[in-house]
């Protein structure tokens, strides 16, 4: 559903931010 899509998008964005902060 829409909520699922939004959650997935936010999760991906959050993961990108975490990856950027963590050298790996």
Swiss-Prot record:
User: Which tissues express it?
Assistant: Expressed by the skin dorsal glands.
Q: Does the keyword Secreted apply?
A: yes
InterPro entries from the entry?
Answer: Frog_Litoria
Q: Which GO terms describe its cellular component?
A: extracellular region
- State the superkingdom: Eukaryota
GO BP annotations, alphabetical order? defense response; negative regulation of nitric-oxide synthase activity
What keywords were assigned to this record? Amphibian defense peptide, Secreted
Q: Where does this protein reside within or beyond the cell?
A: Secreted
Known function: Inhibits the formation of NO by neuronal nitric oxide synthase.
* Family from the record: Belongs to the frog skin active peptide (FSAP) family. Caerin subfamily.
What is the protein name stated in its UniProt record?
Caerin-2.1
